[in-house]
Amino acid sequence: MKNLKKPARLPRKAPSNQTGGTAWGKKLAAEISRMAQSADMKKLILLNFPYIIAFYMVEKAAWLYRHCNGDSVVDRLMVLFMNFGLAYKSVLPSFHPFDLMVGLVGAAALKAVIYFKGKNAKKYRQGEEYGSARWGNQKDIEPFIDPVFENNVILTQTERLMMSGRPKHPKYARNKNVIVIGGSGSGKTRFYVKPNLMQMPEKVSYVLTDPKGTIIVECGKMLSDAGYKIKVLNTINFKKSMRYNPFHYIRSEKDILKLVNTIIANTKGDGEKSGEDFWVKAERLLYCALIGYIWYEAPEEEQNFSTLLEFINASEAREDDEEFKNPVDELFDELEQKKPEHFAVRQYKKYKLAAGKTAKSILISCGARLAPFDIAELRDLMAYDEMELDLLGDRRTALFVIISDTDDTFNFVVSIMYTQLFNLLCDRADDQCGGQLKYHVRLLLDEFANIGLIPKFDKLIATIRSREISASIILQSQSQLKTIYKDAAETIIGNCDTMLFLGGKESSTLKEISETLGKETIDLYNTSDTRGQSPSFGTTYQKTGKELMSRDELSVMDGSKCILQLRGVRPFLSDKFDITKHKRYKELSDFDKKNAFDVERYLKHELRLRMDEEFDCYEVDVSEESTA
């Protein structure tokens, strides 16, 4: 041991650990300075901090090893361990090539050990072996709630979603499209529609489907008193409705095509065998030609469905006389002479390629499709326009669309209106409002399945968010959506960040919700008891997975409860919103019948002539001289 301790002293000439490395050190310092300026420097240091420490310690040990005396490597290592503290008398590293190389080898060795250990490591998720599903809590929903109560979408008693599409932290941004599912009597109107109407944020307009026309009576006065412009489209009682004329909103030829497609998608013609067979395509040509002629050439007061019916009635076709020309043919001949490239002329010429017998069948199909317009009240309803759909995003407006929940005869009118509404608002946002409407337009689409097919709705709902438009699709079951929109139903649901389930028993809906909620891990306790000559008793514990809420549990869910699913957040099992606790509940007719809204009186008031309106004045001489 004496021989081992004797060389423990350092050599007579113990050089400083900076010796011979000044130039190298300056170069390294310059490189470190350059790297420090990068944006990811902090992250880089944190990730490599353990390896930097390993490099430093091994490099200092290498420096000490070089200055230890001994006859063999073992002797020098023993001296190193006995005097290890001397390596850190100076905190500065050594820049000797040998020391640096040994330090790098040490750091690389640590990196390799960690890599292979991590690669072969067992993955444990204690308590989550079969699933990690759980119910959300107040902490989960808190970042999504606006401090100002009115500036939220009401979802449940304890959960809300801020109306702003640009929260402080972008990761909490969600679109305001909501799927509400609830069977008959589950409270879709009471627990969702009315509470959100009572919110009345400063810059929000409403468009809502009103089955049976009860919501406008119960909430209309509150909205009117708050300064909302009330609009009513009533397909149950036309006398209690404002006028709606789709022709008023045609701005270009593409709008004509959209209108025709919507009419065909939501009505049926005689002779129609499939959605896109010969007869339907031929009808489309005729509709485009006639509507194009009416829009371009007819005076404004004649641009309506009544004129379209007159054109079809005058479009006689004879099987035995191919050269016969009806009055409509003559009109188009005159137009062709003036404007041979006219949109209506080009469409009509394609239609006229059909033989007399074929043309007659096409006209019969058109007549069957437009049969509802033979009702004088419907023609009067659509004679001119009072809806001002294009202004919904410019001022506080509440449009009530009253439909029958038992008869869908006139629901095609509603489908046409919604199709035009979406297109008008999107175009106005893009062309006149810099991409966003001045007022957010919320569509509360109660009984969505009864509205009819809105063409390309799956694409519309994916793009309306950026224009300050949102839709709440209210259904009795998910299967209703699939019946109408087929494969596009999944796309529509996928573009709704929020799903609210109020209760129901439809099996496919319960299955999908149960699967979406996921599974949680639970503890399973088993006992065994064997009797006989050698009786035994045993107890075992194990873990297993169970649905957070199974289908049978969903079907018997308490009527006061609901399930909320928000994208990126754990689901919530909460109480339905108590409408009586809202500060504006006393303004509804639910609280006081005196608050009932008189629709007929309001319409009469709205139809009064204003002093600023312009009129055509005609003077008639009724004197005796003129009559003589």
Q: Residue ranges of each PLM-predicted region?
A:
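Accessory regions of macromolecular translocation/handling assemblies
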Residues: 1-208, 215-228, 528, 532-556, ...
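P-loop NTPase motor domains
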Residues: 44, 48, 54-60, 122, ...
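General secondary-structure edge motif
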Residues: 133, 160, 176-177, 346, ...
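A short glycine-/small-residue-rich loop at the edge of a beta-strand within enzyme catalytic domains
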Residues: 139-144, 412, 448, 504
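Conserved long hydrophobic alpha-helices within structured protein cores
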Residues: 149-155, 412-419, 513
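Conserved ATP-driven motor cores of ASCE-family P-loop NTPases powering translocation/secretion/packaging/pilus
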Residues: 461-563
